[in-house]
A protein has these predicted regions:
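Short, charged beta-turn/beta-strand-edge "cap" motif at the junction between a beta-strand
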Residues: 56-65, 83
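Short, well-structured beta-strand-loop connectors
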Residues: 46-59, 78
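Short, conserved secondary-structure segments in the cores of folded domains
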Residues: 41, 47, 64-67
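N-terminal, Lys/Arg-enriched amphipathic/low-complexity engagement segments
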Residues: 1-44, 59
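Structural beta-strand/beta-sheet cores of well-ordered domains, especially the beta-sheet scaffolds
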Residues: 27-29, 41-43, 75, 88-90, ...
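Short alpha-helical basic/polar micro-motif
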Residues: 49-52, 72, 172-176
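Buried, small/hydrophobic-residue-enriched core segments of structured protein domains
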Residues: 80-179
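Short, compositionally biased
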Residues: 65-81
């Protein structure tokens, strides 16, 4: 076993150009089971089903009520399972940009929202799965209340992009998301 105490500084000279450019169009997206520690899915779709962005793909048997939704509209191409039927991925071939609709709130309403309204909206839309508990990085229970929330915007990988460039013109929306 290799143990690193102080990390590794790569001797890379220069810095990346801090611009955002369009990449090649993506044709397939997937939800990867490995990204969600301890999750046991109950599938709500099967191969060949057409889904919208935000459509329920599966729920977690271990974390009641947590919904995992489609990141894009299209057709479910594959549901991959490994040994002992361990969930590996759901692959969606992108086709169109249909999306489910969820409650939207105006800027003036944000400060007055009840906690339960926010939780319900996050769970229904599938965005609740973006939260992680510490130290095991699992998706939290819906009825749990955190002591604190950490928002990580700094990528520590070598030559990572500057977060101010990424947030850029959406800084107001970023700030509203933190309220």
């Amino acid at each position: 076993m290799i143990k690193i105490k102080k990390g590794l500084d790569l001797p890379i000279s220069g810095a990346p150009e801090q611009t955002i450019t369009d990449g090649k169009p993506v044709r397939h997206v997937a939800l990867i089971g490995f990204d969600y520690h301890g999750m046991k899915p109950t599938m709500a779709v099967k191969e060949g089903d057409r889904v919208k962005r935000g459509t329920l793909l599966f729920t977690d048997k271990k974390t009641e009520g947590v919904r995992y939704t489609s990141p894009a509209a299209g057709v479910v191409k594959e549901i991959n399972r490994g040994e002992r039927r361990v969930f590996q991925s759901v692959v969606i071939e992108i086709d169109g940009d249909d999306a489910e609709t969820y409650a939207r709130y105006s800027d003036s309403d944000l400060a007055g929202l009840e906690r339960q309204q926010v939780v319900d909206n996050l769970v229904e839309s599938g965005l609740w799965t973006a939260f992680r508990t510490r130290p095991y990085s699992k998706v939290p229970e819906i009825d749990s209340a955190p002591n604190s929330i950490f928002v990580s915007v700094m990528d520590t990988n070598p030559l990572a992009a500057d977060p101010t460039v990424i947030i850029g013109e959406n800084s107001k929306a970023f700030e509203k998301g933190l309220t």
